[in-house]
């Protein structure tokens, strides 16, 4: 018997570790585009899940952005069924007319579809193929836009996606390993031309910025950026937990927040409290920026009688009688 290729073994170990920790015995789903990362993930999951007594299926999303996308999605589905994954779902999404550009629109539509499929099938978890390289790119993009700790924490290894856990088991695996695993398994991954299109910021980081950093600072750059994300994520989780407790402590029975209570909080916690409250009010996380949180902060620590702070979705927040109070869009003040 031929020895198992090290990249294949590494990916299977990562999948096993992720699945063993799942408390819900329900099925798992792999999100697979047919690219090397998600294809290696799907192949490993098809091998590991049954050996843990767990069923595993696959969902592939056709964004309809390229000629032949429907045929490619069908080919991924056929391969998945032949590999033993079940159920297998193909979902077509429409990304036209969505705000934020094609990259953001495709991502939003994809995750909405994945959430619906996972919920409909009662999946315990949805697995995606994001790698250590993806994490490094995410950190660089966050740095470029001036993100705070939450952005620098990168992609979490797990988070809730509707009723299912979203798992990223390959964040400690390199893109080189997923490609090598596909080669070792005789798989022919699809190469997404968008990944090399300089119109997209992530593609430019992948093709130009990260290679330049590796040349200038050495090959450990990718690992170090990913490690930075892990370290920041630990601190961010602790601060978020403090903020959750603090939010309850400053909340007024009418739904507003006590200005005095907010002012007593340390800035790192206060900013998180205001961010969490804005989300409770209905501000979309993707649209909620540091500028919006800063406007809320100014109502607490920079009060000079100014008017309302404006949040995404037409929401407004006023300072009244020692409280921050939300005003419905369109309401007369």
Swiss-Prot record:
Please tell me which top-level EC class this enzyme sits in. ligase
- Kindly list the positions annotated as binding ATP: 33-38
**Name of protein:** tRNA(Ile)-lysidine synthase
Instruction: Extract the GO molecular function terms from the UniProt entry.
Output: ATP binding; tRNA(Ile)-lysidine synthase activity
The UniProt similarity line reads: Belongs to the tRNA(Ile)-lysidine synthase family.
Instruction: Work out whether the entry's keyword set contains Nucleotide-binding.
Output: yes
* Known role: Ligates lysine onto the cytidine present at position 34 of the AUA codon-specific tRNA(Ile) that contains the anticodon CAU, in an ATP-dependent manner. Cytidine is converted to lysidine, thus changing the amino acid specificity of the tRNA from methionine to isoleucine.
Q: Domain comment, in the record's words? A: The N-terminal region contains the highly conserved SGGXDS motif, predicted to be a P-loop motif involved in ATP binding.
* Encoding gene per record: tilS
Highest taxon, organism lineage? Bacteria
Please give the catalytic activity noted in the UniProt record: cytidine(34) in tRNA(Ile2) + L-lysine + ATP = lysidine(34) in tRNA(Ile2) + AMP + diphosphate + H(+)
